[in-house]
Amino acid sequence: MAGKGEGPAIGIDLGTTYSCVGVWQHDRVEIIANDQGNRTTPSYVAFTDSERLIGDAAKNQVAMNPTNTVFDAKRLIGRRYSDPSVQADKSHWPFKVVSGPGEKPMIVVNHKGEEKQFSAEEISSMVLIKMREIAEAFLGSPVKNAVVTVPAYFNDSQRQATKDAGVISGLNVMRIINEPTAAAIAYGLDKKASSVGEKNVLIFDLGGGTFDVSLLTIEEGIFEVKATAGDTHLGGEDFDNRMVNHFVQEFKRKNKKDITGNPRALRRLRTACERAKRTLSSTAQTTIEIDSLFEGIDFYTTITRARFEELNMDLFRKCMEPVEKCLRDAKMDKSSVHDVVLVGGSTRIPKVQQLLQDFFNGKELCKSINPDEAVAYGAAVQAAILSGEGNEKVQDLLLLDVTPLSLGLETAGGVMTVLIPRNTTIPTKKEQIFSTYSDNQPGVLIQVYEGERARTKDNNLLGKFELSGIPPAPRGVPQITVCFDIDANGILNVSAEDKTTGQKNKITITNDKGRLSKEEIEKMVQEAEKYKAEDEEHKKKVDAKNALENYAYNMRNTIKDEKIASKLDAADKKKIEDAIDQAIEWLDGNQLAEADEFEDKMKELESLCNPIIARMYQGAGPDMGGAGGMDDDTPAGGSGGAGPKIEEVD
């Protein structure tokens, strides 16, 4: 529970391509805009020669710096380097990914002139820090507690890794909840007043990078997830890619040139395509104009909504398959679905809406909640509930989540014996008794798997441990109780106990899956602090540089001013001019100097200019006509000017 004085708890939708943050305030959810005024923030982190950028600033410079701009960290989090999906993704990314210790994928970038490696958790933690800062700027107070969302499809290790990212960012992650569940909460709150009896709601979440379909029942504020399905690799980016490929071909036809080898050209084209896609959701055609795209050739073209739909038709149709699977899993007919809820920016595409509406025989779709914000909205509500913030309005909302995959262990012959079937409401606990397979067997190997296949080799091994010290006995005699226990965050504990001897062993499914150790997390928390300090150091530097620049240019303008120039002694004027020229020249050559160097230069310049200007004012006598008022735009002596206050400001 959130202690008092920790500020309100926030809800964060940590997305593959964009993230969003909300907070419960004044009896409602507030989705918070960032410093650029955007209510969603790109999940991008960029490293440059001089600084680290997160969010819009990172995404905006991606064309200039593609190899050191990291995005899609969510596609790596909690996975192994050898995972086929990591290998497939790797080929599409401009940044480099290598295998680190324990097969953990590490992202390689150049930062401040040296090579650095970051895990997906660290990159995600930087995005989380950004989201937290956005909330803190809005609330005006520190934020410690958060609810963070993940796709329903995420397995145990991906959930753990997301939690770790929270820890590294300095947040207390009160709970990890499924994105569709969060959207359902947002929706349930909207609809609560009118609802009577049980409602079946299908949540169709087509985001930038992932696609989730979930079926929930909502009754009197109780949400239950009946089934989930989806595709971890389908989303807005895929639609962008289709358009990019289309235009790459067009460029080839028109200009006989292939731009695929040029990351910057591709990136500029992709940015234009993303913009065009958004436009085509509200207009029938749009133009793309990119100056000097490749080898000085301008690329001007148009695309119609019909053409965009044709390029993506197979993908749009593919979106309907998980809908059918979800209904099958929940043993429900599509006519029993009361509401179909759209989540994720890509659900704005008219064709997607039309296909979905046709599938549900013309049923109206729920679009009352901004699809980009629904998940963060629900997370913010959940955060309010968990921290006891909200009023009666939210307190009686209860949330039942489910396991996305069946959990079980391997029994003789490589058979998957399921203890917890998929779509079981969590938290949950199941026990089952097993025995030995051969006479006098001294121990058993408990191998924990997740997956839907009958044989363990086709499923995903979560972890294993041994229970030894079983006294000699004929096969089938010893009784070994195996217990599977999943908590509210979907984190699994498996224990085994030999009934006769009381021998016990257990595993928390975390470490064997590339989970970060305590030490690693500690180290990363310190790194995060270090980067924050560096970022602040950099800001200090920039501020000091700007102060010096402003002072020099203001002073130059001051002495150009007729009224003032006429009062200046020629030698003094020359002295000031030379000093300013020298300062500006020094600035040009030392853009990356340290803050104190800028400050020293500033003091030098001031100690020369200020006395001269002050003398001029005193010499002018009372009849100079409001000389006092000149303070506003002249860098006057002492503390009147913008300059000397630097140390006090920081």
Curated annotation (Swiss-Prot):
Belongs to the heat shock protein 70 (TC 1.A.33) family. DnaK subfamily. In cooperation with other chaperones, Hsp70s are key components that facilitate folding of de novo synthesized proteins, assist translocation of precursor proteins into organelles, and are responsible for degradation of damaged protein under stress conditions. ATP-dependent molecular chaperone that assists folding of unfolded or misfolded proteins under stress conditions. Mediates plastid precursor degradation to prevent cytosolic precursor accumulation, together with the E3 ubiquitin-protein ligase CHIP. In cooperation with other chaperones, Hsp70s are key components that facilitate folding of de novo synthesized proteins, assist translocation of precursor proteins into organelles, and are responsible for degradation of damaged protein under stress conditions. The keyword Nucleotide-binding applies. Expressed in cotyledons, leaves, stems, vascular bundles, roots, stigmas and anthers. One of its GO terms (molecular function) is ubiquitin protein ligase binding. It comes from the Eukaryota. The keyword Transcription applies. This is Heat shock 70 kDa protein 4. It is found in: Cytoplasm, Cytosol; Nucleus. Residues 620-650 are annotated as: Disordered. Induction: Induced by heat shock and cold. Induced by high light treatment and oxidative stress. Up-regulated by viral infection. Induced by infection with the bacterial pathogen Pseudomonas syringae. Induced by abscisic acid (ABA), salt stress, osmotic shock, brassinosteroid, cytokinin and auxin. Keywords: ATP-binding, Chaperone, Cytoplasm, Nucleotide-binding, Nucleus, Stress response, Transcription, Transcription regulation, Ubl conjugation pathway. Disruption phenotype: Abnormal embryogenesis. Defective seedlings with high levels of reactive oxygen species and monoubiquitinated LHCB4 precursors. No visible phenotype under normal growth conditions. InterPro entries: ATPase_NBD, Heat_shock_70_CS, HSP70_C_sf, HSP70_peptide-bd_sf, Hsp_70_fam.
